Regions:
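Mobile-element integrase/transposase regions
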Residues: 1-24, 32-36, 173-189
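Active-site beta-loop-alpha junctions of metal-dependent nucleic acid enzymes
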Residues: 9, 26-50, 231-237
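Active-site-proximal acidic segments at structured loop/helix or strand boundaries
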Residues: 107-209
Length: 246
């Protein structure tokens, strides 16, 4: 809730569960667009202290663009993240919860348990709500099982952790991919500013890889330019002298 206007802003809960131990990672996000969706995976791997051999996502747009009996299509940014962590994406079939029955039940339980724990609270900042979800996550993972000894955290440490792949030296930095036609002034936009590319690409369609700090331009699969991404809008394009006509 906005403390001044009373306006309610939505938030989205990301939940990832390890199928053997039911160890949970949950994170509150402002949206579930590609960048946040991928960043939640990065945070989950850091939380688990390792990488799963398989990823079985639900069929939301940020994770699967097409999933039919004959064809599966994964968004480029999501596949790039999976390649970085050396894991395979195997989307669950639409309306087929039996593809991951243990995880499906655990996700539903974790979601219900966390949301039930905060449903009667009114939050006046996203950060407050996010931190509360993080606190409830720890309580959930330390909550004793009813049917057996231990809890989710102890089950993970004893039964599943040794089978996780090791983390890479540095966390993956999420990237957004776009396509654009190079303008007559041999620039492309990133949504905030314009950046130059080699002038001989005028009129060509290029792929743009955007991270928080860099703008990379690819043509026919090869990188042709890379520039530091500006955080603030500026009037003039960012021009690289080597891109200019002779």
């Amino acid at each position: 809730h906005d403390s001044v206007t009373g306006e309610i802003s939505p938030a989205y809960l990301f939940v990832g569960v390890l199928s053997c131990s039911s160890f949970v990672y949950a994170e509150l996000c402002r949206d579930m667009k590609s960048e946040n969706f991928i960043l939640c995976h990065v945070h989950a791997y850091e939380y688990f202290g390792g990488v799963t051999r398989l990823l079985v996502p639900d069929n939301l747009k940020a994770g699967v663009t097409k999933n039919t009996r004959y064809e599966t299509s994964i968004p480029r940014a999501y596949q790039e993240m999976a390649d970085y962590y050396d894991t395979a994406i195997v989307p669950a079939r639409p309306k087929a919860p039996d593809d991951k029955p243990n995880a499906e039940a655990s996700v539903k339980f974790a979601t219900t348990w966390i949301l039930a724990a905060v449903r009667n609270r009114r939050f006046f900042s996203f950060e407050e709500a996010r931190d509360t979800v993080a606190e409830k996550l720890e309580l959930l993972n330390d909550r004793p099982f009813k049917a057996r000894k231990g809890c989710r955290r102890s089950a993970y440490e004893e039964e599943e952790r040794e089978f996780m792949h090791p983390l890479p030296p540095a966390p993956y930095e999420p990237a957004i991919w776009r396509s654009a036609k190079v303008q007559n002034d041999y620039t492309i936009p990133d949504g905030l500013n314009r950046y130059s590319v080699p002038c001989d690409l005028i009129g060509e369609c290029v792929d743009i890889r955007l991270t928080r700090d860099t703008v990379e331009i690819y043509f026919h699969g090869g990188r042709v330019a890379s520039q530091v991404r500006l955080k603030k809008a500026q009037r003039d394009a960012v021009m690289e002298p080597g891109h200019m006509p002779e």
